[in-house]
């Protein structure tokens, strides 16, 4: 891997596929889900993640899967992404009881339409660039994996008029819906974050719910490299500097939603989620959260 290919600065109209730019983050996270799945105590097993890594041909991630890390430091990122995956899995399991519409924003290689048990009649709308959605569907079809809900791929760039594309895919704004915005916000400017939430708010009927969050609301590559000195093997980013793909200006999602009348549950970080899942966060997880500032939010529109 090289920083020139994956760590280039963003532009307002940049594009990507599954092995470049922002798209590579989806592949990397899928790799960590696959690693957590083969670990001793996976919180949210994803048996399909390994298919994406194999199909990508990415040498680094395929080597990781062939020789899975074992130490508490080396498994930190897979473990923490397992925690994040469990959070959003639980959100959809809970929200599905009150809606037949689930929307996964910037779906990437999210396999919840295929992994989770959805109530009969549920439609899962996956929003992302066409080439990303096509890669996912093609790989899973090759392995005979079928979605467990009606899956509607919504090929759209979030910087364009994606609500119109969502409407065209059959979304009904007059009915309650459940939305996930997972790991996306660091890759958007504050203005883009505001626009995203405003559009979601406009599309949500009363009773709708949203979950948003990321392992890192900020990512300082230099601090991560420095952490390697005391926690060897923790930096599974290799030489890729993903902080070059993120923006420093941020919106506070909890405040934004509350100001518009949404009922926001207490904001939690990774360490609090781990404790809630019966885990004792090891020292490396505490250090990582201090660097990355995780936050996870659930809100309901009354």
From Swiss-Prot:
S-adenosyl-L-methionine binds at residues 128, 157-158. Its EC number is 2.1.1.-. GO terms for molecular function: methyltransferase activity. InterPro entries: Ppm1/Ppm2/Tcmp, SAM-dependent_MTases_sf, SAM_mthyl_Trfase_ML2640-like. GO terms for biological process: methylation. It is an enzyme of class 2 (transferase). Disulfide bonds: none annotated. Keywords: Methyltransferase, S-adenosyl-L-methionine, Transferase. Signal peptide: none annotated. It comes from the Bacteria. The keyword Transferase applies. Pfam families: LCM (PF04072). The keyword S-adenosyl-L-methionine applies. Belongs to the UPF0677 family. Exhibits S-adenosyl-L-methionine-dependent methyltransferase activity. This is Putative S-adenosyl-L-methionine-dependent methyltransferase MUL_2961. It comes from Mycobacterium ulcerans (strain Agy99). The lineage of its organism: Bacteria, Bacillati, Actinomycetota, Actinomycetes, Mycobacteriales.
């Amino acid at each position: 891997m090289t920083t020139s290919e994956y760590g280039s600065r963003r532009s307002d109209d940049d594009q990507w596929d599954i092995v470049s730019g922002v798209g590579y983050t989806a592949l990397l996270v899928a790799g960590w889900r696959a690693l957590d799945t083969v670990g001793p105590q996976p919180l949210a097993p994803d048996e399909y993640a390994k298919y994406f890594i194999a199909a990508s041909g990415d040498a680094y991630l395929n080597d990781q899967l062939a020789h899975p890390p074992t130490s508490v430091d080396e498994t930190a990122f897979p473990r923490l992404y397992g925690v994040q995956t469990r959070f959003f899995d639980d959100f959809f399991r809970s929200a599905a009881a009150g809606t037949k519409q689930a929307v996964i924003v910037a779906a990437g290689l999210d396999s919840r339409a295929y992994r989770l048990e959805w109530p009969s009649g549920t439609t899962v709308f996956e929003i992302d660039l066409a080439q990303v959605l096509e890669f996912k569907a093609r790989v899973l079809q090759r392995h005979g994996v079928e979605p467990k809900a009606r899956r509607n791929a919504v090929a759209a760039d979030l910087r364009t008029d994606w609500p119109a594309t969502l409407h065209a895919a059959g979304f009904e704004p007059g009915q309650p819906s459940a939305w996930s915005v997972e790991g996306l916000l660091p890759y958007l400017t504050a203005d883009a974050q505001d626009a995203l939430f405003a559009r979601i708010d406009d599309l949500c009927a009363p009773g709708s719910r949203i979950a948003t969050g990321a392992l890192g609301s900020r990512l300082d590559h230099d601090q991560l490299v420095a952490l390697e000195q005391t926690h060897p093997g923790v930096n599974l980013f290799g030489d890729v500097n993903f902080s070059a793909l993120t923006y420093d200006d941020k919106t506070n999602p909890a405040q934004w939603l509350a100001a518009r009348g949404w009922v926001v549950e207490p904001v939690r970080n990774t360490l609090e989620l781990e404790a809630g899942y019966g885990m004792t966060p090891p020292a490396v997880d505490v250090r990582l959260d201090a660097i990355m500032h995780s936050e996870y939010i659930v809100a309901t529109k009354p």
